[in-house]
């Protein structure tokens, strides 16, 4: 990407520009000349899109200028990106479930686009290591929220709707996307040359908190493969702190695995009800004669 303006000339002067419209209106916030969403309220998918558009423009003209995780000026922007408060509207039970599910799906898509902006695998070392890994762990939480809403929506469907090929395909795609995201999240723990020790240690601690919420929604074979990878990381990872985080995660996931298997076994053991015979309203043969 072309970088035409040196950051040191513009950053002290134009890092943030707040223009207050009136006491009752929200402040307009600009980052290096690009308008971004209000960081004082939860973001939705449209806010993430606005941020993504702004940061793409910034990244095309400024070197090393994306918001940092702990920057004095940019920290609040990044913290809003990965704030738990952003999930509250999606989990608001008084809002229509299907709308909340669609919003969670759109937000996850834009988070993945933000990750692509922050990750640069052409680089020997990641320029935004902490920020990129933070977005990955936050995306796992968003994926778990989407799965929760998808499950709730699924339970509202009739048996015929649940067996609808289109519905089943949508559920399959959601599970496949979650499996891919989870696998990628663990892949990053092995990139010790591109990410520093401090960043990977923090990331592994975040993963140990986020993975259980998503693990329960994964398919049986994916859960089994994930447990094997966690065990390998707990024994063989380069950094002892990462090993410790994975060891703490293991019993949590194993407990979930046993619980899921127990419920599946109980469901299989349930006697299947014979189909109810339809009421025969035809005239008996003898009466008809």
Task: Specify the residue positions occupied by each region the protein language model found.
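Bacterial N-terminal signal peptides
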Residues: 10-21
